[in-house]
Curated annotation (Swiss-Prot):
The family this protein is said to belong to: Belongs to the UPF0758 family.
Record GO terms (molecular function): metal ion binding; metallopeptidase activity
Source species: Clostridium beijerinckii (strain ATCC 51743 / NCIMB 8052)
Motif stretch (JAMM motif): 178-191
Keywords: Hydrolase, Metal-binding, Metalloprotease, Protease, Zinc
NCBIfam families assigned: PRK00024.1 (NF000642), radc (TIGR00608)
Name used for this protein in its record: UPF0758 protein Cbei_0490
Transmembrane segments: none
Annotated positions binding Zn(2+): H178, H180, D191
InterPro entries: MPN, RadC_JAB, UPF0758, UPF0758_CS, UPF0758_N
Amino acid sequence: MESSLKIKDIPQNERPKEKLLTYGAESLSNSELLAIIIRTGTQGENVLQLCSRLLSELEGLNGILDASFDDIISIKGIKQGKASQILALAELFKRFRTLKAINNDIKITSPKDLASLLMGEMNELNQEVLKVVLLNTKNIVVGIKDVFKGSLNTSVVHPREIFKQAISKNSASIIICHNHPSGDPTPSREDINITLRIKECGNIIGIQLVDHIIIGNNKFVSLKERGLI
């Protein structure tokens, strides 16, 4: 039966590692690429089947990037070792994405510039994530950091965590950005209150909050453009 098919029982030219060596990494599916990282399956399920189910349960690559250790380890067949491998891979991807933005000297001249930079990543996240985008005196991105995950409110969003990142990079100004998993980027009263609190703290320490961008389903709202900050 297919459910008990082992990798060694799959024709050699169809195995992920052999396909990569023969045709290149770009020829592999997401589950095949992940299978090369994870390497082994579980009883009654080979590594390809495990990775396919993992991607399905986490709703794709965006889900993996958004997942916590507890999210991953709750999936049948995933133990600490495999969960650690997946989290390490996700973190490397996040760091590469940030380095790419920094090395390309991306300049933010409008809310659309920032939305274009982050929308692909944040569009399909399953929970709210608040990022701080760090800018130099020329409005060029020098860093992008995740600072909070989960439902955002003034009791959990601490300005010190945001400005700690800015100070460490000698940032002249910052933009904060978060997503609404509902797909509707309309700012809530809590969103506005958080923004005003961060703006006030920035004024005190001399690091300007330029804007707060909220991303929904292929659309965004700038609180600055709406006159809310």
